[in-house]
Structure formats: C-alpha cells, structure tokens
Curated annotation (Swiss-Prot):
The keyword DNA damage does not apply. It comes from the Bacteria. The keyword Phosphoprotein does not apply. Residues 1121-1144 are annotated as: C-helix_2. This is Intermembrane phospholipid transporter YhdP. Its main location: membrane. It is found in: Cell inner membrane. InterPro entries: CHP02099 (IPR011836), DUF3971 (IPR025263).
C-alpha cells in the first residue's frame, strides 16, 4: 500500500509522457494526413460497405485538440442514391472529451451536404421506432453537436414526387440522453417551392432509441401536396393544398403517442365531376391520442367551409381499437372503428364524394344517385372490422333528403332516431310535408303530409324478422294506419303479413298509389284513368303469404284491398264518359279486380245491376254487364262521348231516339288499348225516332233491335209518321271505309192528313197513296256523311183540285218517283210525276235549307239538266194565274218560305197564263238579283217590261209595251171602267216599296194611252203620287195626289192639269166623238174625296176646277159619253132650247171664241158663278149649282144674242172661212130679228139627265140713246 502512490505517480508520469509524445506525434503527423487519404478511405469503405471518396483531407493540432477539414466527400447509397459534402470542418476538444468520457467537439459543421435517396418516405416500415443505424449512432451519440449549412436532402414523398428538403441552417445538440434540434427547413419539388418550416425537437434517448419527447413544426402557407400519399395523387385530382399550421407530436417509448395540429388558415381545391371543389379552414384544431393499444382522432369544433358553405359547428371523433382478448369461447374481439359525430350537414360533404367514390365505387354510385342532404344531429357507430354484421349504432337526424336509388324511394323532411345493432335494432321515423319519389313503382312522388312509423328488427341464426308498428301516414288524399311483419326463417319460406285501414277523400288521386311494378303498366294505365273521384272511409288492406308466390294462383296466400267508394266518378274506359255520383265497391283480390254497384247513371240513362270484373290482370280485359233504362234522347249524346262516336254515335245523330228505352249491355274492354266490344239489345215501346237527314220524326215507334259494337239490326218496327201508320226496319254495318245505315219504309197514307201541307192544299186533296221507300246513309270515318233516299208510289186513289197542272181526278193512275242523293253539305232531289213531268233540283244544307238550283220540265220524257247557275227554272203548261194567286192568298206558300231559302234567280215559262181576266201568251218571266236588288223581266205578246226592285231606292218599272184588255171587264152605267183591285177587301200598302213607273206604250181596255209616268211614295198608310203623266200625243194629263188609307179615315186627293190643242182630236184618239170641235183646252183641277182613288164618292167630293176652251164649235149637241162636261153644266140642254126657240136663227153648230169656267165642289155640290161661253151668235153666262149626289140641277143662264159684222163675221172667218161666209149672209138676213132681242134668261132645274129649262125673262134691246 505504501508503494501505491509511487506506482500511481510513475504511471501518471508515463501517461503524460505518452500523451505528450502522442500529441507531439499528432502535431507532426496531422499536417501530412492527406498523404494517407486512400488508406483512410478504404478503411471507411470496408467498415461501412459503401465506397467513399474525398478530394482532400487536412488536419492540424490546436490547444484543445485536433482539427480536421475534408473536401468533396462523396458516397453512393445502396438504393442508388448518393451522399456528398462539399466541406466538413471538425474541431475535437480532447480535454472535454476526456472529462465527459464522450466526444466533445468545439465545431462540427457540414457545408453543402447533399443527401439523395430513392427510397420513398412512407408511413409504414419494418419498425415503428426510430432505431439508430450506423449513421444515426454517429450523428446522435458520437457527435455532441453538429451544424448543417446550405444543405439539401432529396427524397421521394409519399405522393411519389421527388422533393428537395433545403436546410439553410440547422443546429443539432446531443446530450447523453437528450437530443435537441432547431432550424429552418424548406421543401421544394418539380412543381415549385412548398414553403419554409421552423422545426424544433426535444427528444430523449432511452435504450438506444429516440423514444420520448416532442416535436414542434410551424409553417406559413406551406404546400402539403407532396406530403400526401401516392394514392391521393392517383385518385384525387388535387389542385392546391396550401395551409398555415403548427403541429406538436409526442413520442413515448419510441412510439408516437399523440399530437396536436393547428390549421390556422388555408385550404385545398380538387376537381370533381363537373366543378372544382374547395375546402378552407379557420383555426381548426385536431388532437391525436394513442390509447394503448388504439388510436383516437378528434376535432372538437369543425371550422370547415366547403364550396363556400360553412359547416355547422360540430364535433368529430374517430377511434380505432385493436383486437382484444376477452376470454371465453370466442376469446378474441375484432378490432373496431368507432365514430362519433354531431351536427353534420350532409349537403356540405358533397365535395368529398369523389374521394368516397375512389374508396368505394359502390358508395360513390349511391352517393351520386341519392345526393343526400339534411342534418345528422348525433351519430355513434361501433364497427367491428372483422365482423361488420355486429355493428352497433345510435343516431338521430332531422330533415334528411335524398333522391331515389334503385328500389330505395327518395325522401325529404325525414327525421328520426336509430338505436341498437344490425342484429337487433329500432327505428322511429317521421315525415312532414314531404315528397317521396318512387319511379318504376309509383307514377308520382308520394306527397306525405304527416307520417309516423316505428320499425324494429331481429336478425339471428334463426332468421330475420322485420316489424312495423304504429304506422300512420297522411298523404295526398289518403290516410292509412296499420302495421306489417315480415319473416324470413333461416331454413324456410318468407312470409309477409299486412293489415291496414285506409280512407280517402279524393279517389281521383288513387293513381298515385298503384305499384306499377306489381300490377303492370296497362292495369295502372287503366285504373289511373278509371278512378276519377270518390270517397272511402273504411277501406281495408289485408296481405298474408309468401311474397315470392304472389299472385297465389293456388290460394296459398291472399292479397286483398276492399274499397267501398262513395260519390265516385269512374270511367270504365278512358275514352268513354265517366260515371258520376257512383257508389261502387272495388275489391282487389290477388291479381284480379271485382267491381259492383246497384245502379249508376250512364249519361242520361240509368244502369242497374252493374258488374265490372278484371278476373286476371295478365289477361288485361275488363268485362262489364248492366241493365239500362232511360230516355232514348240521352243515348245518342252518351255515345257521342265514346269511341263509337263516328259509328254508333253518328248513327244516333242521324237516327235520334226519344222516349224511355230498355236495354241489356255487355262490354268487353281490353286494357291494352285494343277496340272495345259492345253487345246488347234495345226494346222500344211507343218511342219516337227523329231521322235527321229527312228532318222528320217517327212517333209511336215500337219493336226491338240488337247491336254488336256499331252493327245494329232491328226487327220489324211499327211507328206513326206524319200522322200516318208506318212500317220500318233498319240495320247498320261498320264497313271498311264507312259506317252504313239502311232504313226500309212503307205505308198507305192520306196526303191531306199528313200535317205537312198547307191547309189550302189539304182542302184540295183527298184519297190515299200506297208507297214504299229506302234510306241509305254512309258515314265515312274520315269524311262527311252521304245518303240516298228513294220513294215510290201511285197517286191513283188521290183526287186533287189544285190549279193546273196539279189537278187530278181520282182513279187516274199517276206514278211518282222521288230520289235524293246528298251529303252534309248538299243533296240533289230528282223525281218524276207521270210520264211527262220531270224535276231536278240541288239543295244546300246550312243553318237553313237552301235551294241552289232547280228545274221543272212539263211535257218532258227525260230528266232535264240543272241550270248552269243558281236559280229556279219552271217550264210549265198553260196555267191559271188567278187560281194560283187565290191559293197563295190562302197561305199555301207561307210555310214554305219560312222553312227554306230559295234563289232569287227564277225563270217561269208558259205558253199561256190566265191572270187579271186576260190571257198572257208565250210569257217568260225572269227574276234575277242585281247589285242593288232584284230585276224582273217579263216578255210576251202582251208585255215587254222590266221591274228593278232596288234595295235603297224606289222600285223602277220600265214598260216598253203593255196591252191589258180584260175580257170580262165590267163597266158601270156611266161607262167607266172597273177597278183593277178587289172592292170587297181593304188594300193595305204598308210595306209597299216606293215606285217609279215609266210606260212608253200602254194599252188599256183596247185603247192606247201612250206614255204613262208616275212616282209613288209610301209612308205608313199614305200613298203619294207625284209627277203623274198621261201623254197620248193629242192630250197631256198631269197629276199629283195622295191616298190616305186609314180605316175609317180614308181620303184621296188629286190635282193637276189637262192640256191639248184640239179637244176633238184628243177625244177621237180614244174613239170618242165630242160635240166640241177645233178647240184647245186647258183644265186645272184640285179634287179630294173620302174613298179610294178609283171609287170617287160624290158625297165627300170637294175641290175646284178651272176650265178654259179656245175657239171652236159645238156641234151635235146630243152627245153621250163625251159630252158629260156640257151636260154637267146643262149647256147642251140650253143649246137645244135655243135651237128650238130660234130654229130659224141657230144652225147645226155653235161657234164660240172661248169657254171659261171656275167650279168649286163642296160635299158633292158643284158651284159656279162665272161660266161664260163667248159665242159668235150669243154670249152665254151661267151660274148655279149641281148636286152630284142627287144628280139634279139648279142653274141660271143668261143668253145675250149678238150679231155683229165686225166681230161675229170676223170671228167666224177666223174659225172657218166657209162658215164665216155663211155667218155673214145670215147676219144680213137675221139682223132685224136679233136687233130686237137683248137678253134671254133661263132657269135650269131637275135631274141631270133630263133637265127642265124655263125662260124667265126676254128683255128687248134698248135704243142707243137710252
């Protein structure tokens, strides 16, 4: 022990000497280290297994220890990468190393270190810990610290991209059990710079591992795309992923046990199917915890905005629990994935659907089809990854919505809860004001007003059971309540049971609830159109059986829906009229439908005992049977609303029934759109049948007819037609191009009792006619109807007293044939009466029957052609116009004019027409319309005239020639012609047109009147004559007047002038001899009386007459007809008296210079006081009155004889030179006598035809002196 200090001292001294020698050796050797560089590199290569290169090695010894500097170090890695350092500086502190017993460096700096590896950095590896390799041992344990300057690490990122990790500066400190680092790291790749991160690490080294500690990262606007896995890059079209973040990671015992991520700002974008989706975060935090042996990831607040829509505030937690040993038989519990979430908005997840589609294409397809939306309030899922059929769940949601996917109906406003597991669970659901589209099943979305349901299930080794309880749904027009149970035993057949009560307030909405996939399209088509309304309070749905065996052809199950519809509207065929106010029971049994009702209205008829059956949906046929009773007039309108409109309906339009009918109806209706078959029989009792083409009605129609669709066939029917008995039968046939109707008719009728002829015609007919007829009607399917009628009969037993040519005695055969061919627009009526009379006509059908053109040909052997233009042409035998006018005056033509419209162009030709007591020979009368009315032309032997019947102007009659000489014209005792108008009836000219008459040459009663003009104006009961004129060439009469034809106040007034140069010539033009010769005349008159113009009433005659005659002679005083004016004033009687008294003085004639007279008439008494005859032999002045009513005279006459050579002889010579000579001679002889007579006075009285003339005074001539 005593020698120990010495030994130690000696040892220490030796060590110091050795160390000194070593240091000295190093001082000498280190500068020459580069010379041993190859050997040193080979040694390193053999130790590492990698070839190492260096361009230079330099070293030196400092006070603290050696320093080393190496240049251009390069090594190749096993994965094909490389490691290189531009320069390494190393300064070893020997004394500190000895003190701490580990390497202590004053400086260890790597300049421009380049590390390139081809091995991708993945999340998995052979070991989860950071084990030390040779390099890690060197850098983590051998170096107490080191620095990296301008270095770079190149590696493959998880996405497969090569990334460059630039390290501008990094300092690493190593303690024996603690490792710390701090610096800047910049990541870049081929796509550009990805940001700069600050890195801090504080790790502890236990058992050779970096097993404990924390790592902190911080980066602003860093691109995370390179750090995402290759799967993400291959499957997600990620465009951007820029975030500002901080992160903490905790390492415990070499494993990552937790961490926190704080995403301050940033977002990502990726390309979807049709648009680019975006995600942004705002201070989103996430916490990762490793709870042995599982993991948990939680986001306490989802501060996420996707596609511009913020997520609602919620939380999300994911946990993975590894497989556990729980003991027992199955001592292993599968690893589980547990999910907890709240306030998830499904619509906000649409952006991640492409990710889901890549993870699970099936899930992506469902998501894309359903497009879910709504809110999941809470969600808890425990999913055993090795036994997913044992998943446990609990959830609640509100207002979920999705679109239909396959047989999953769409929904909206779907709220509810879910609890339990896949093996045993419970679902409660509710919907309000929601629509559930269910295409291929229902034709319209189910419109749910309020729905509640509770559904539970049990799924185990015995089978599957699904129960629905308290199902209460109020949908559009339907309220259903009930439940169901579905059983699927493990080794047995399934069974479904349903019991539900149903009510509806609108049966027309039933089409919404027919499952088309079960019932078939055609049946759903049919029922959708058939049920158009109704109510049901107690409908019942019952189902029991194996759904796979539906429709239970062998009664191994039952499906039945019994619906008692009330107030229903039901259309058994879509194109047929719907039945209304119907109480009908619908019984859906398996694949059939049975319907029945006690009674229903088919239009206006009643159907009873009605049944409608669809025995088998697959056969697609509806069978209907019913008894029908109702008014026949309602049958036609009913079929007009059916597909039989163009056939049976059109027939019933042409043949319209009225009265009650009884029928049996059977309908066979295919549901696939094929034609309906309708059969039945109709019984008629005292009905009526309106035949529209004939516009006539058969009454008291009795009999039967049957029908098959549009084909009708009747038995012999009896009826009454036009008040006459009739036998009729008819049939119809549906042809290839048209629907055909045939009617056979026959009877024996009395024409006078048919009720269709005017009464005046009936009175002229008697007897009966046997006839038969056929009516054929064609109703083309794509055109208008056509028809033909043929009637045949013999008028042998008929007696006619109608005017010729319609007169006929009984017993004389007269065959009649009438044919009609036409359509809905027109028809042609032709016929033959006897052998010589044919007629042809064309009629137009519109709002009123119109005769377009017609021709009647008497004495014709063939059918004459129709006129070329619209009009009527009558070629008649000799006719008695008076008889026809008398017949028409009795109203024979009134009904004809009201029932039809006739053309205005009418031509009548006859060899002789008796009218107005005159025969008009070879007469042709043509009436034709003009622009302003109608023009009538009449030509014949006795007339050539036109009458313009103008609409807005007076009628104009232009008569070129008229000869009217009635053969039986009667004259009065005074030889005046009779009136052309009847005297027994009052003439009413109200409504007569104004007229202008211009006659160039007129003859009346065999006498030529010459020119006759007149203008006639009608105003109420007043007829006004203006511009009246009769100009014979020898005399001219003008007249204006008025005829007031008021009953009880009739009045006629006329005024005008009568002029002429020679009164005897004017009189002789009419064949009358007048006693006045060579005298001009001028008469003005103004007369009025209270009767018709041609019936002057002397008692009411008033007026004034101015008469002036020029120089002339009065001869042959005893004149008759032409001397009325002289006789009226008794001039003729006075002359006779003078001739008698002075027969030696007066000769055969009396010459005068003038005759002037003014006479006024008052109530039939004519007065005059200035009648003056200025004669050559005497002057005669007369005054007094003539009573025209009593026809007597009361006149005074003064005769002043005068004979003067200067006056009288000169006047006589002026009148007639020969007479003047005689007067001159007489004046010489008679001068002494006349010189003694001065004045003669006479009083004339007595009857007008035999006046009494008494001389009152004969006054001698006084002397001149006196």
């Amino acid at each position: 022990m005593r020698r120990l200090p010495g030994i130690l001292l000696l040892t220490g001294a030796a060590l110091v000497v050795i160390a000194a020698l070593l240091v000295s050796g190093l001082r000498i050797a280190l500068p020459h280290l580069d010379a041993w560089r190859p050997e040193i590199l080979n040694k390193i290569e053999s130790a590492t297994g990698m070839p190492v290169e260096a361009s230079q090695l330099s070293a030196s010894w400092q006070n603290f220890g050696p320093t080393l500097e190496a240049h251009d170090i390069r090594a190749e890695l096993k994965d094909g990468g490389e490691f290189s350092v531009k320069r390494v500086t190393l300064a070893l502190d020997v004394w500190q190393s000895l003190l701490h017993m580990r390497w202590q460096f004053r400086d260890l700096t790597f300049w421009q270190l380049r590390f390139r590896t081809n091995t991708p950095i993945t999340s998995g590896g052979s070991d989860d810990s950071l084990e030390a390799s040779h390099i890690s041992d060197l850098f983590l344990r051998q170096f107490d610290h080191f620095d990296l300057r301008d270095s770079e690490v190149s590696f493959l990122t998880p996405s497969g991209q090569r990334a460059e990790l630039a390290i501008p500066q990094l300092t690493w400190l190593n303690d024996p059990r603690r490792h710390r680092a701090e610096g800047l790291v910049s990541l870049s790749s081929l796509t550009g710079q990805h940001g700069v991160m600050q890195v801090r690490m504080d790790l502890r080294d236990d058992e050779g591992l970096l097993s404990n500690g924390r790592v902190w990262l911080q980066a602003d606007d860093i691109d995370l795309k390179p750090w995402l896995g290759k799967w993400m890059q291959d499957n997600i079209a990620l465009e951007t992923a820029q975030f500002s973040l901080e992160g903490w990671m905790t390492i415990d015992k070499g494993d990552v046990t937790g961490g926190d991520v704080w995403l301050k700002q940033g977002g990502a974008s990726w390309l979807g199917e049709k648009q680019t989706h975006t995600l942004s975060v705002d201070n989103l935090t996430a916490h990762i915890t490793r709870e042995n042996p599982g993991w948990q990831f939680s986001i306490p607040d989802t501060r996420i905005t996707m596609d511009g829509k913020p997520w609602p505030s919620g939380a999300l937690t994911l946990a993975w629990i590894p497989e556990q040993d729980v003991g027992g038989k199955d001592n292993k519990r599968s690893d589980e994935l547990r999910i907890r979430a709240s306030n998830l908005e499904l619509a906000g997840l649409e952006g991640i659907r492409p990710l889901a589609a890549k993870l699970s294409p099936a899930l992506g397809d469902v998501w894309r089809s359903t497009q879910p939306s709504g809110k999941i309030n809470t969600l808890a899922l425990d999913i055993p990854l090795q036994a997913a059929d044992k998943t446990r769940f609990q959830a609640s949601w509100s207002d979920l919505a999705w679109k239909q996917w396959k047989l999953l109906p769409g929904a909206e406003h779907f709220s509810g809860t879910l609890s339990g597991s896949v093996e045993n669970g419970l679902l409660t659901a509710s919907m309000k004001q929601a629509k559930m589209p269910y295409e291929t099943v229902f034709r319209a979305p189910l419109e749910i007003a309020d729905g509640q349901a509770t559904i539970s299930w049990l799924n185990n080794n015995k089978g599957f059971q699904l129960d629905g309880r308290n199902i209460d749904v109020k949908a559009k027009a339907v309220h259903a309540r009930g439940g169901f149970r579905y059983l699927q035993p493990a080794n047995d057949e399934p069974w479904l049971g349903i019991l539900a009560g149903i009510s509806t307030d609108d049966g027309s909405q039933a089409w919404r609830y027919f499952p088309e996939n079960l019932m078939g399209k055609d049946l759903v088509d049919y029922l959708s159109g058939a049920i158009q309304g109704g109510e049901a309070d107690n409908a019942t749905l019952v189902y029991g059986g194996n759904p796979q065996l539906f429709p239970y052809k062998h009664n191994e199950g039952q499906f039945e829906v019994l619906v008692p519809l009330r107030n229903a509207k039901f259309a058994f065929q879509p194109d047929w009229p719907a039945l209304t106010n119907l109480d009908i029971e619908l019984d859906f049994i398996n694949d059939g439908l049975w319907m029945k009702t006690d009674g229903v209205n088919l239009g206006g008829v009643r159907a009873s005992n009605l049944t409608a059956v669809i025995p088998d949906y697959s056969k697609e046929k509806l069978l209907i049977d019913a008894d029908i009773k109702g008014p026949g007039k309602a049958v036609g309108p009913y079929f007009d609303e059916t597909p039989l409109k163009d056939s049976l309906g059109a027939t019933l339009q042409e043949l319209q029934l009225d009265g009650d009918v009884n029928a049996r109806l059977h309908l066979d209706i295919p549901l696939n759109g094929e034609l309906v078959t309708a059969k039945g029989e109709v019984t008629l009792r005292n009905n009526s049948l309106f035949i529209k083409p004939l516009d006539s009605t058969l009454k008291n129609l009795s009999g039967k007819f049957s029908f098959i669709n549009s084909d009708l066939q009747s038995e012999p029917l009896t009826a009454s037609w036009f008040n006459q008995p009739l036998n009729v039968d008819f049939s119809t046939k549906e042809g290839a191009k048209a629907y055909q109707v045939a009617v056979n008719l026959n009877g024996n009728w009395q024409p006078a009792k048919t009720g269709v002829l005017p009464e005046a015609v009936n009175e002229a007919l008697s007897g009966s006619v046997a006839w038969d007829g056929k009516v054929g009607i064609d109703l083309p399917y794509h055109a208008g109807a056509t028809y033909n009628i043929e009637l045949n009969g013999d008028l042998k037993n008929v007696s006619s007293h109608l005017p010729s040519p319609l007169a006929k005695p009984a017993g004389e055969p007269l065959a009649v044939n009438v044919k009609v061919d036409g359509n809905l627009n027109s028809f042609e009526l032709t016929g033959q009466a006897g052998a010589d009379n044919h007629f042809n006509s064309r009629w137009l059908l519109g709002q009123k029957l119109t005769l377009d053109r017609a021709i009647w040909a008497a004495d014709s052997k063939t059918l004459p052609p129709l006129p070329e233009q619209s009009g009527v042409e009558l070629n008649m035998p000799p006719m008695n116009g008076a008889e026809w006018l008398a017949l028409f005056q009795k109203g024979a033509a009134e009904s004809v004019g009201g029932a039809a419209s006739f053309p205005q162009h009418i031509t009548l030709r006859t060899p002789m027409l008796s009218l107005g007591n005159q025969q008009w020979n070879n007469l042709s009368i043509v009436s034709q319309p003009t622009a302003n009315g109608t023009l009538v032309e009449a030509q014949g032997r006795e007339i050539n005239a036109t009458l313009a019947m103008r609409n807005n102007a007076p009628w104009l009659a232009n008569i070129k020639y008229l000869y009217y000489n009635p053969s039986v014209a009667k004259t009065r005792g005074d030889s005046t012609p009779s009136s052309p108008f009847p005297t027994t009836e009052r003439i009413n000219f109200r409504g007569w047109p104004d007229a202008q008459i211009r006659c160039t040459e007129c003859w009346f009663w065999g006498q030529k009147f010459g020119r006759i003009d007149s203008d006639i104006t009608i105003s109420g009961d007043t007829l006004t004559l203006t511009n009246g004129l009769i100009d014979t060439g020898f005399s001219r009469l003008t007249a204006d007047g008025e005829w007031v034809n008021n009953p009880g106040n009739e009045r006629t007034s006329l005024k005008g002038k009568l002029r002429g140069q020679k009164i005897d010539a004017a009189a002789e033009f009419f064949g009358v001899t007048t006693p006045i010769r060579q005298s001009s005349f001028n008469v003005d008159y103004d007369l009025h009386w209270r009767k018709a113009p041609w019936q002057p009433d002397e008692a009411t005659l008033n007026g004034i007459i101015h008469t002036q005659l020029g120089k002339g002679e009065i001869t042959e005083i005893n004149t008759g007809h032409a001397g009325q004016l002289l006789r009226l004033l008794s001039v003729d009687a006075l002359m006779r008296k003078l001739r008698f008294d002075f027969r030696d003085t007066f000769g055969e004639g009396f010459y005068f210079d003038s005759i002037r007279s003014t006479a006024w008439i008052k109530d039939g008494v004519m007065h005059t006081d200035d009648t003056l005859v200025d004669g050559l032999e005497a002057d005669i002045a007369m005054k007094g009155s003539v009573n025209l009513v009593r026809r007597d005279l009361n006149m005074e006459a003064v005769v002043a004889p005068e004979i003067s050579a200067t006056v009288g002889v000169a006047a006589a010579f002026a009148v007639n030179p020969i007479v003047g000579a005689a007067v001159f001679a007489a004046s010489k002889v008679l001068g002494p006598l006349w010189s003694k007579v001065s004045i003669l006075r006479y009083h004339i009285s007595g009857p007008l035809d035999d006046p009494q003339i008494n001389e009152v005074l004969r006054q001698p001539r006084k002397e001149k002196a006196q």
